[in-house]
Amino acid sequence: MLFSAIKVTMQNRLSKYFFTLTNNKNNRSFLKLDVSLQKTIRLTYILNIETSTKNCSVSVSNNGKLVGIKELNNGNYSHAEVLHPFINDVLNEANITFDKLNAIAVSKGPGSYTGLRIGVSAAKGLCFSLGIPLISINTLASLAHSISIEDGTIIPMLDARRMEVYSAIFDVNYNQIREIKAEIIDENSFLNELQNNNVYFLGDGAEKCKSLITHANAVFVDSKFPSAKEMCVLAFDKYKKNDIEDVAYFEPFYLKDFIAVPQKKKL
């Protein structure tokens, strides 16, 4: 005799899952619930912090899906003033409290020395106080994930002052195929990549390269900054792999040493 199929519903998901159970004691069996359902039995909330550029961005994700975001790019580094209010705002938007967070993810760099310090300090403080793991995200990888292409390569660039940028190269599947570099851009930059296929340049370092990189295969994507939105999937993937940092010893990836600029004397 076959019992009626039982409908299983979890976390307001639309998908329906069924199992059947036989009354034969020697052949009692059931169909396993779908793997995707098993993964949603526990909700994983991650707070994502991005402060590597002028864009101060904070998001909350649930199993890799964006459920709250707040960001501001007003041309100034106002991260110290807005970061903590933004954190409270996104938690309210996601309708959760700090104790529901499973991890904190932070953009590790490269980028602004001051911006990275602010974001990492906040992330580490939360991890210590909440007793949850810290996840670091490659800033350029996160930026690369903000666009989708069918062919060619992606070169995210972050401004490193004057004609220097922080850059890396990614393929269509977001695999990093060249290490991160601090490099001075000239008319010969990325010629090998440009000769083969389209190259998509993006980030706040790409704008100043337009006048130098004029190859027909060069495509410049406007107005792209690293955002906590793209961190959601990346952070959840690392969380599932237990790819976490030592909170006590973690430091941002500056790539270059910080050089203080002397202030001008007031007359």
Predicted features and spans:
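Surface "functional belts" at beta-alpha junctions
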Residues: 41-42, 65, 133-226, 254, ...
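Glycine-rich phosphate-binding/hydrolytic loop that grips phosphoryl groups
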Residues: 221-254
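N-terminal beta-alpha supersecondary unit
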Residues: 41-108
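Short hydrophobic targeting helices and cationic amphipathic motifs
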Residues: 4, 19, 28-31
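DPxDG-like acidic metal-binding loop motif
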Residues: 103-134, 139
